[in-house]
Amino acid sequence: MAGPTYDESAIIDVRALTKSYGQVRAVAGVDLRIGRGEVFAMLGPNGAGKTSTVEILEGYRQRDGGEVRVLGLDPAKQGRLLKQQIGIVLQSTGVDQYLSVAETIVMYSGYYPHPRPVDEVIELVGLAHKRNSRVVKLSGGQ
């Protein structure tokens, strides 16, 4: 029997995603498709399953049911490969706020076997003009 087909133009393709913690259903049948270049926000009250959903997409948490593809990969089965292609930045982190943008990228590049050049990453995220700025001086969105 053939498995489900996926929209290959989608960066994220989620079908019938479920996740429970004991008797509590945190994620109940989420369907989601995000295409290249789309901007997406997930909003909801505490306990709505936002963090669980994102952690499943990142490959840091196992789903109970449903199908997930991120960049064409199943995070549950190909998490290591996926993590080499994505980056997650939380608005508040434990990073030293007095490091510069460039110093911070150098520090995190050590987690990757084949990191991109620092200046390339800074350019990709639109922070070339903030290269030497201290992280503490950046806005939350930067």
Regions from the language model: what does each represent?
Residues M1-P4:
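N-terminal acidic, proline/glycine-rich, low-complexity intrinsically disordered segments
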Residues Y6-Q142:
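ABC transporter nucleotide-binding domains
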